[in-house]
Amino acid sequence: MADHTTKEQKSFSFLAHSPSFDHSSLSYPLFDWEEDLLALQENSGSQAFPFTTTSLPLPDLEPLSEDVLNSYSSASWNETEQNRGDGASSEKKRENGTVKETTKKRKINERHREHSVRIISDITTYTTSSAPTTLSKETVSRYFYMPITQAAIALNVGLTLLKRRCRELGIRRWPHRKLMSLNTLISNVKELQKMEGEENAEKLQDALEMLEKEKRTIEDLPDLEFKDKTKRLRQACFKANHKRKKKRSLKSDQSQVPSCSSSGSVPSDESVDEAGMESDEEMKYLLCGFSSEFTSGL
């Protein structure tokens, strides 16, 4: 036990021989630094370097008058008001532009509407006032031998108006084709009358008078249909004319090409003559019926 204590004393014996250390310097080190700083400042203030300063002479400044201040303030106020006015004017211009565009569109629409109303009013007035007075049945019947388009031009009316007026007058179909067909039939009978001579002159004359009478009745009553005998006579005349034309063309071909008669492609003169005779006989029979009807009517 005693040995152990002696060893501990020996181990800490170096502390007794260590130099003395002043602990007062560690107690408040900040205060010492402040004192050093103050001393340095005093020394630097006492040993200040002289600086050379140069001063320029400044002009005497006069205070601004109220007029100048008012002018500056009014100018700035005017600028702000002008900017506001420019913005307002641009907005007004835009509004005016849109208003002008809308007014233009309205004017254009009104013009179109007025034009269409004027056209409709003209048509209605023309149809209601002028059509019944001028387009009578007698006036319209003068143009039956024209196609309906040419008749409308000659009457200086529209095609639709003319058709409407015809329906009002009881004319369902324009009788141009019917009357022209009768004229063709009358001309065919006249040609046959020249060819026959005095043999069947009386019968042909009776047929012509019957056809002229039927034409006048159709002029008065345009919706009247042809009689059966007139239809058959028209068909017979058409066949006879067709066969005559065929015979003429056959003769012209045979005169140009003599060898053509031997071929079977071209009909012979006898067959054409037989067909022509049949059609002529049919025409004569129908003409006899016309003459008998004419005499019985008398």
Swiss-Prot record:
Gene Ontology CC: one annotated term: nucleus
GO MF term set: DNA binding; DNA-binding transcription factor activity
Assigned keywords, A-Z: Coiled coil, DNA-binding, Nucleus, Transcription, Transcription regulation
Record keyword Transcription present: yes
Any one Gene Ontology BP term: regulation of DNA-templated transcription
Composition bias type Acidic residues, residue spans: 270-279
Localization in the cell: Nucleus
InterPro entries the UniProt entry points to: RKD-like, RWP-RK_dom
Comp. bias (Basic and acidic residues): 1-10, 81-102
Highest taxon, organism lineage: Eukaryota
PROSITE patterns for this protein: RWP_RK
Annotated Low complexity bias: 252-269
Coiled-coil regions listed in the entry: 188-222
Annotated stretches, region: Disordered: 1-22, 73-112, 241-279
Domain RWP-RK: 121-203
Job of this protein: Putative transcription factor.
Name listed for the protein in its UniProt record: Protein RKD2
